[in-house]
Design a protein with these regions (language model features):
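Non-catalytic C-terminal interaction segments of nucleic acid-processing enzymes
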Residues: 3-14, 18, 151, 156-249
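Active-site metal-binding core of divalent-cation-utilizing nuclease and nuclease-like domains
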Residues: 15-18, 77-112, 117-124, 153-155, ...
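Surface-exposed charge patches
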Residues: 24, 82, 130
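Short aromatic-centered micro-motifs
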Residues: 26, 104, 168
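Basic, amphipathic alpha-helical patches used to engage nucleic acids or provide basic targeting signals
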Residues: 116, 120-148
């Protein structure tokens, strides 16, 4: 779903600020867009104006857009993005024939923020990290772990075995996640890169808890749970870390 476009002067225009009948251009493929922001049943968005000459280009662009739509459509995802200025949302990056659209880009920090509510493949997770890192940007992910209920569990300190006891550090909490769930999302990532940071949010009795994954242990050779050693962050500290000051931009 396309929420931003360029006017003929090169200005980025959010869909809610677009005018019917005005010419807009797609940031990704450069072809014409029309604003669809008059209805109330669907989320407002831009759509490509059919162009026979550029049909293949538009088809590929729509395919990329459709891949993003499931995540964008969630109220959870939109509520996070809307905390940032419009010029920092849905920022398009191109390198060679590769095109990615960041949920949020903080140029002063050289950081990309990705909000992940729906499931993501490990291939997509690694592709985005590799792409943004190749441009010199760090990536901070926030995953909605409420969507993984039943696939991971908190380990109380009284239940630490010898293995966990060897790795846990003061101030850390430990979660176990079944290996299939972990690998399908993160692949072989184990929190070793200084340019890829993964946080997750979970809700309990309407309270939000934020955790930063510090260390991941477990062997992919054996069918055993992965252990996530995390630092829990106060909400204010977490919001500051992703560029939201005092809870608001």
């Amino acid at each position: 779903m396309i929420l931003f476009a360029l006017d003929l002067a090169g200005n980025r225009i959010y869909i809610e600020n677009a005018h019917a009948g005005t010419a807009y251009l797609c940031e990704e493929c450069g072809t014409r867009l029309m604003a669809k922001n008059k209805g109330s049943e669907r989320q407002h968005h831009y759509a490509h104006v059919p162009d026979e000459k550029n049909r293949g280009i538009q088809r590929d662009c729509k395919w990329r857009s459709d891949l993003r739509t499931e995540n964008q459509m969630s109220e959870w995802h939109r509520s996070w993005q809307e905390r940032y200025p419009e010029n920092q949302r849905e920022v398009v990056f191109k390198k060679g024939d590769r095109i990615f659209r960041a949920d949020v880009f903080l140029p002063e920090r050289r950081e990309v923020i990705e909000f992940q509510h729906s499931r993501i493949t490990s291939e997509d997770f690694h592709a985005r990290n590799e792409f943004y890192n190749s441009l010199g940007y760090s990536v901070i992910w926030l995953f909605d772990f409420d969507e993984l209920e039943g696939r991971y569990q908190y380990i109380h300190p009284d239940q630490y075995d010898d293995f966990v006891q060897r790795f846990v550090r003061d101030g850390q909490k430990v979660y176990a996640m079944d290996q299939d769930t972990y690998r399908s999302t993160f692949g072989d990532w184990k929190a070793k890169s200084k340019k890829v940071h993964v946080c997750f949010m979970r809700t309990y009795n309407q309270w939000r808890f934020y955790s930063y994954i510090k260390v991941v242990t477990g062997s992919f050779k054996y069918d055993m749970p992965m252990h996530l050693f995390v630092i829990e962050m106060k909400e204010r500290d977490f919001l500051s870390r992703i560029g939201i000051n005092n809870g608001y931009r």
